[in-house]
UniProtKB/Swiss-Prot annotation:
Residues 1-33 form the signal peptide. The gene is fdnG. PROSITE patterns: 4FE4S_MOW_BIS_MGD (PS51669), MOLYBDOPTERIN_PROK_1 (PS00551), MOLYBDOPTERIN_PROK_3 (PS00932), TAT (PS51318). It is found in: Periplasm. Its EC number is 1.17.5.3. Coiled coil: none annotated. It comes from Escherichia coli (strain K12). The keyword Amino-acid biosynthesis does not apply. This is Formate dehydrogenase, nitrate-inducible, major subunit.
Length: 1015
């Protein structure tokens, strides 16, 4: 309606007369205003899941299109799903802009090719793309494929081409990617977990048995204390964080935040304590000391459910920053002394009185005794009073009827001690008795919508689906491999569920290779690639730098923006023969060869890399499942057709794969058998359907299956309902054993939508499906005491009813009755949570404070002779690019904003408007010292390069007094680059160092040295 002010008054004055005249039939030809039709009236409603972070918020998408042959469905509205038990209809600013992402002007529509030395793209057909890529791959594979190593062991590996895998893709795409990469012999396979939550698995699995978030989003509401450290949940996971506010508002919970910045999470906290980035282990070890010294532990829990009572070998020691067994030349440990004393039966010796000097309990007490409140204040910069306040509140949850939940994210993982950061906190939860409890646990807040799923599916260099390990070349045959990976119980009468490893592995091989996998050929063991070392991204880009890599696949991954030392990344990509980018959007990686001035100053003519840019679908254009942070597998449905000629990832991979296999069939070559034996028996091999792959992940009975009593449990060809049915005799097949039960003969369990919650605990067992076996809280046997009675009846998860375990969750336990020696941590050989991690961690069985590689102190106050992590892998060329405090005196740390998601949302107009321009944050004191005013343009530099941005001078950052000096922090949001609809900016990772966590090689993005000057 277009009405002037004058017309408006005329209409109002003549309102009665006008309606009367109209009633007599003298109505105007067109009304000035009329009721608008409800815009969703004729729409088709589709349910989906948000593609951004791992809260997994529910979506309702609305599209037009009647399904006619020539009609194209098109989404025109997206909103939150009010039925979803986590999000309850809410979306964060990222989710609110999803429609702009789906319809972004930067969506790719056609396959494109960039020739060597060219400065432009040329459009090509899919056939041209598949044909050329397959020829390049075959030429490289035939030239560099290694069938046997120097010792004559069959290894079937291809090291000169690698692949990055998309954590925004579905689990079904992930499994197709796994089959694609492993059949080719690729070992340089990684996903975003390598640069974000790799330390989560590396720490939680050794401590508890599984490497995943132990509870779930809604369960946070059950906590009495919510501690957010190593993350900023209100900013990065705002809809998930509502459950922390629910705990605060309705359960009288205390919210604690420990962070270098006064964040959005801190703004609603009851207690905020500042900390220097990179010193979390000191803070948390101080908490451990406080709990022990003040006897604020759940003593019965510690005695029965942790390895506190087990005796450690006499030759284990710690002195001056190093544990026993250190080899300074190799920069690694001989870990043989990091183990238990064993009795004549091979079981660990035990002292339940906890008085033996070599029991874990007393060794732990001695180890953390150095971390006094004064030491914490000196190293962390945290005022002693603030630290003690945090300790007191945490200690209150040592009572059986109170719990703390820890929420963490990349603020803990992205350090050279990332895995040990997490382990220290996990040890606190064991002392407090908070593991397995409703409102307790260790909650890893995953960053990408399906990073949990791709980790589950083993898309990492040395992994296989279901947290199985890809064989190494030292495991020359199947027997040696199974012996190396199948643990023996450390204590008598334990579940030791990993003893079923052979069943999981053989079932995987049957799924991979079908009828070709037989007992006579060790189920196709030789066809798997065997590794000699981990080819993580830091390692692989150093190989690129040395000219040892020919090709690289980037599937839904933007390494130019995501990997450390951006200038080195661009230099490395410039040395490739070819690169294939599969993505819905334009990325800096796909255009790394273009000159964008200071932010990417390259000469296209000198870059000889062939680049293929292949347009893929986004979340809204495909069916499939993704796993949120709480391990919930949620099925989503396609809402529209992809733009232009874009195809889904599975179809793209299948196209390349079949062209490559056809070349090998006609021409022969290296490694033919592993490539051709991989099963790809889909109804449409060139376009596998999500439901087919999902059922493959779940698993089938290949013969009639009977239980120990001869009762038929599954007929041949039926889908399995439990991984307990998997066999090691070739009669079952499952691509990912932990997903068994997700799609059964009763249907797709991941599509379940019953949000009823009879217990009030938020477990909603009828919504979606959680691995393992729809269990919502891991280790929930530990929620009850040794007699089977809940520690807190109001938060009962499971209990013993006299004949079996039952309750408000699926029991994470067998049938052992209370009073038996069987421990609650069923994946561990001890059946216990580990305070002492034995030989499972790279730098020690207990956490220890080590400075970041680039330290603002130049020393380590605890042990000056061992400053940084002594087993960190640092390549010579990267070491030359490390800065010193004299030139770069300030701590740099990167982080996210709630309006953006990494570098995706700068392509979405709404998000670009919300946060349009790159900025950095500095304190008022640093601004005054450098003569910088709020809004000034500044240059932030490290030894590796520089960025320019707007300065935001804020009280959210303050200098900390550390070891006799003031330490300032420069806060650096990560969301800008030289592509997108937002204002062009510099890539934050220009500044970050190329060094990683010693266990997972996750880069140290959170603590490095910079300088800042007015531009």
């Amino acid at each position: 309606m277009d009405v002037s002010r004058r017309q408006f008054f005329k209409i109002c004055a003549g309102g009665m007369a006008g309606t009367t005249v109209a009633a007599l039939g003298f109505a105007p030809k067109q009304a000035l205003a009329q009721a608008r039709n409800y815009k969703l009236l004729r729409a088709k409603e589709i349910r989906n899941t948000c593609t951004y972070c791992s809260v997994g918020c529910g979506l309702l998408m609305y599209s037009l299109g009647d399904g006619a042959k020539n009609a194209r469905e098109a989404i025109y509205h997206i909103e939150g799903d009010p039925d979803h038990p986590v999000s309850r209809g809410a979306l964060c600013p990222k989710g609110a802009g999803l429609l702009d992402y789906v319809n972004s002007e930067n969506r790719l529509r056609y396959p494109e090719y960039r020739a060597p030395g060219s400065d432009k793209w040329q459009r090509i057909s899919w056939e041209e793309a598949f044909s050329r890529i397959a020829k390049l791959m075959k030429a490289d594979r035939d030239a560099n494929f290694i069938e046997k190593n120097e010792q004559g062991v069959t290894v079937n590996r291809w090291l000169s081409t690698g692949m990055l895998c998309a954590s925004g893709a579905s689990n079904e795409t992930g499994m197709l990617t796994q089959k694609f990469a492993r059949s080719l012999g690729m070992l340089a396979v990684d996903n975003q977990a390598r640069v974000u939550h790799g330390p989560t698995v590396a720490s939680l699995a050794p401590t508890f048995g599984r490497g995943a978030m132990t509870n779930h989003w809604v369960d946070i509401k059950n906590a009495n204390v919510v501690m957010v450290m190593g993350g900023n949940a209100a900013e990065a996971h705002p809809v998930g964080f509502r459950w922390a506010m629910e705990a605060k508002n309705n359960n009288d919970a205390t919210l604690i935040v420990v962070d270098p910045r006064f964040t959005r999470t801190a703004s609603v906290a009851d207690i905020y304590a500042p900390i220097r980035s990179g010193t979390d282990i000191t803070f948390l070890s101080g908490v451990l000391r406080y709990l022990i010294e003040n006897n604020k532990i759940n003593a019965e829990y510690v005695k029965h459910y942790t390895n506190a009572s087990l005796l450690v070998r006499d030759d284990f020691a710690f002195e001056d920053g190093l544990f026993s067994g250190y080899d300074a030349e190799k920069r690694q440990y001989d870990k043989s002394s990091w183990n238990y004393q064993l009795d004549e039966n091979g079981y660990a010796k035990r002292d339940e009185t906890l008085t033996h000097p070599r029991c874990v309990w007393n060794l732990l007490k001695e180890h953390v005794s150095r971390y006094t409140p004064d030491v914490v204040e000196n190293i962390c910069g945290t005022p002693k009073a603030d630290f003690l306040k945090v300790c007191e509140v945490l200690a209150s949850t040592s009572a059986p009827d109170r719990t703390t939940t820890f929420l963490y994210a990349l603020g803990w993982t992205q350090h050279t001690v990332g895995a040990q950061n997490i382990r220290t906190m996990a040890m606190i939860q064991l002392l407090l008795g908070n593991m397995g409890m409703a409102g307790g646990g260790v909650n890893a807040l995953r960053g990408h919508s399906n990073i949990q799923g791709l980790t589950d599916l083993g898309l990492l260099s040395t992994s296989l689906p279901g947290y199985l390990t890809l064989p190494s070349e030292k495991q020359v045959d199947l027997q040696s491999y199974l012996e190396a990976n199948t643990p023996k119980a450390t204590l008598a009468d334990q579940v030791n569920y990993w003893s079923n490893y052979p069943k999981f592995f053989v079932s995987l091989m049957k799924s991979f290779y079908g009828d070709a996998a037989q007992k006579e050929n060790n189920w196709g063991y030789d066809w798997l690639p065997k590794w000699d070392q981990t080819y993580d991204v830091i390692k692989y880009f150093n190989m690129m730098d040395e000219g040892k890599v020919t090709g690289y696949f980037c599937q839904g991954f933007n390494p130019v923006a995501s990997f450390p030392d951006k200038n080195k990344v661009v230099s490395c990509l410039s040395k490739l023969k070819y690169m294939v980018v599969i993505d819905p959007l334009v990325t800096e990686t796909s255009t790394f060869w273009q000159n964008h001035g200071e932010s990417n100053d390259v000469d296209p003519a000198s870059i000889q890399t062939e680049v293929f840019r292949l347009p893929s679908t986004c979340f809204a254009e495909e069916d499939g499942s993704i796993a949120n942070s709480g391990r919930w597998l949620q099925w989503h449905w396609k809402g529209q057709d992809a733009p232009g000629e874009a195809r889904n990832d599975g179809e793209i991979l299948a196209g390349i794969y079949h062209h490559l296999r056809e070349l090998y069939q006609s021409e022969g070559g290296k490694g033919v058998e592993p490539l051709m034996k991989m099963s790809w028996n889909y109804k449409q091999p060139h376009e596998p359907q999500s439901d087919e792959v999902a059922k493959e992940n779940n698993g089938y009975a290949l013969e009639d299956l009977y239980d120990a009593n001869g009762v038929l449990i599954a007929k041949k060809g039926q889908l399995l309902s439990s991984f307990a049915h998997l066999r090691d005799d070739g009669t079952t097949a499952s691509s990912c054993w932990i997903y068994t039960g997700s799609w059964t003969e009763q249907g797709n369990q991941m599509a379940n939508r019953d949000n009823s919650d009879p217990s009030g605990l938020g477990n909603t067992l009828g919504w979606a499906w959680a691995w393992p076996l729809n269990r919502r809280v891991l280790y929930n046997r530990a929620s009850a005491d040794i007699n089977g009675k809940p520690w807190d009846p109001k938060r009962m998860l499971i209990q013993w009813n006299g004949s079996k375990w039952t309750g408000n969750d699926i029991p994470d336990f067998g049938n052992a009755a209370p009073g038996t020696p069987t421990g609650p941590f069923i994946m561990q050989p001890e059946g216990m949570g580990r305070l002492f991690a034995i030989n499972k961690m790279a730098e020690g069985p207990f956490p220890e404070h080590y400075e970041p590689i680039e330290t603002p102190l130049g020393t380590n106050p605890l042990h000056p002779n061992v400053v940084s992590n002594p087993v960190v892998r640092l390549y010579e060329q990267d070491a030359l690019r490390m800065g010193k405090k004299e030139q770069f005196p300030y701590v740099g740390t990167t982080y996210r904003l709630t309006e953006h998601f990494h570098t995706w949302t700068k392509h979405a107009l709404l998000n670009a408007i919300a946060q349009p321009e790159q900025f950095v944050e500095i304190s008022e004191t640093l601004a005054a010292a450098k003569g910088i005013n709020n809004g000034d343009r500044v240059t932030v530099s490290s030894k590796r390069g520089f960025i320019r941005a707007v300065a935001v001078v804020t009280r959210r950052l303050k200098p900390l007094n550390v070891n006799g000096q003031q330490v300032e922090t420069v806060g650096i949001p990560i969301h800008w680059g030289f592509e997108g609809v937002a204002r062009k900016g510099y890539i934050a990772n220009t500044l970050t160092p190329n060094v990683g966590d010693a266990n997972s090689q996750t880069p140290e993005y959170k603590a490095f040295l910079v300088n800042i000057e007015k531009a």
